[in-house]
Amino acid sequence: MSEVLQKAALAKEAAAEMVMKTTAEKNEALQCIADGLRNERRLILTENQKDIEAGRNRGLTPDIIDRLTLDEKRLLDIADAVELLIGLEDPVGESLETIQKENGLSIEKIRVPLGVVGMIYEARPNVTVDAATLCLKTGNAVVLRGSSSAIHSNIALVSVMKRALGLSKLPIDAVQLIEDTSKETAKQLFTLNDGLDVLIPRGGKNLIDLVVRESTVPVLETGAGNCHVYIDESADPQMASEVVINAKTQRPSVCNAIESLLIHEKWAEEHGRKLLNQLTEKGVELRGDQVICRLEPQAKQAEEADWGAEYLAPILSVKTVQDVQEAVRHIQQYGTNHSEAILTENAEHAAYFQTAVDAAAVYHNASTRFTDGFEFGYGAEIGISTQKLHARGPMGLPALTSTKIIIKGNGQIRV
């Protein structure tokens, strides 16, 4: 039996146990995990350093190395986030709807765990802990399949979590890591309908597209983030500068950072030169149309591929447009339904943009960087969904549940 089949079978057995666990038992396990991450941080950081050195030797980009890196502060922040989960309301068992029929039947819809959640993700060790603990909180088992770039970190993190589960009342097998990171194990997960209830990809556009295209297991799509800001003709120059710089430069490697900037042609002529210069001074490589290249000599001529690119790096495509309608058409053609923003003092233009743009989160006069479970007040998230079924936007704990209908009677029969 392959590693994937073996560990998925163990997770399925654990899921049957998890459904019976109380909130108190799950929270106790989460506390054990948080303590374990703190107490064994030297081991984790040592193993993470192996991944970092290997990544540098392989020529991974600085942005990928940054996502891969765990230092003491980041690791302690991860442990703190696990403890925050303890304080969040457990959605399992929540009553969503109750109907009392005239014949005496009581019909109640409640939240229940999904079962076994598969996670396939790239060089982000924090996802290993985030995914595992979110699944445990919601009564699920999880099968983790990270990338080869983070294998030492992932093995260390999962071993710490399993030791912590051994100190709790939750089954140790509720968390499984596929250590073979070959393409073959990914393909096995794609078609493991008997072992997985859902598959969640976390990573770049290529990974997500691959999973959506090839998986027969139901997929919760955490979409790529080709996010846009559109600066309308009436946008306040100071606010526009602050929002755009924040949305691009605060953390370029995350999915809610903008990858493309659209500027009304009149605003560009009046204020664009200063903003483009500020972006260049911040180390952002600009790829623009002819107007942008004229206004900012350091900008490179954009190619067609740039309009649809998710750079996850300090690179920004910039295009001038005639009006808000053209901006919306451009976003509908090249966007990924993630997070889009309009900067304007025109309420009608803002309303049009927020209605017409098809995205999980649509902003007026704010940075796209707020698309996040904690920032929205949802608590922790498993990812940001860009699909329309089951869940959309930041997926908190309820997104890791399904529903069950409980019917209680006293001998009723249908006639």
UniProtKB/Swiss-Prot annotation:
Domain of life, source organism: Bacteria
CDD domains (alphabetical): ALDH_F18-19_ProA-GPR
Gene Ontology biological process terms in this record? L-proline biosynthetic process
Query: Could you name the Gene Ontology cellular component terms for this entry?
Result: cytoplasm
Keywords from the UniProt entry: Amino-acid biosynthesis, Cytoplasm, NADP, Oxidoreductase, Proline biosynthesis
Question: Is this entry keyworded Amino-acid biosynthesis?
Answer: yes
Reaction(s) catalysed by this chain's protein = L-glutamate 5-semialdehyde + phosphate + NADP(+) = L-glutamyl 5-phosphate + NADPH + H(+)
Q: What is its EC number?
A: 1.2.1.41
Matching entries from SUPFAM superfamilies are given as: ALDH-like
Pathway listed: Amino-acid biosynthesis; L-proline biosynthesis; L-glutamate 5-semialdehyde from L-glutamate: step 2/2
Its annotated compartments are: Cytoplasm
What the entry lists under InterPro entries is as follows:
Ald_DH/histidinol_DH (IPR016161), Ald_DH_C (IPR016163), Ald_DH_N (IPR016162), Aldehyde_DH_dom (IPR015590), G-glutamylP_reductase_CS (IPR020593), Glu-5-SA_DH (IPR012134), GPR_dom (IPR000965)
- State the function annotated in the UniProt record: Catalyzes the NADPH-dependent reduction of L-glutamate 5-phosphate into L-glutamate 5-semialdehyde and phosphate. The product spontaneously undergoes cyclization to form 1-pyrroline-5-carboxylate.
User: What does the sequence similarity comment in the record state about its family?
Assistant: Belongs to the gamma-glutamyl phosphate reductase family.
NCBIfam families on file: PRK00197.1 (NF001221), proA (TIGR00407)
HAMAP family listed in its UniProt record: ProA
Fetch the PANTHER family from UniProt: DELTA-1-PYRROLINE-5-CARBOXYLATE SYNTHASE, GLUTAMATE SEMIALDEHYDE DEHYDROGENASE
Q: State what protein this is by name.
A: Gamma-glutamyl phosphate reductase
**Organism field:** Bacillus velezensis (strain DSM 23117 / BGSC 10A6 / LMG 26770 / FZB42)
UniProt gene name: proA
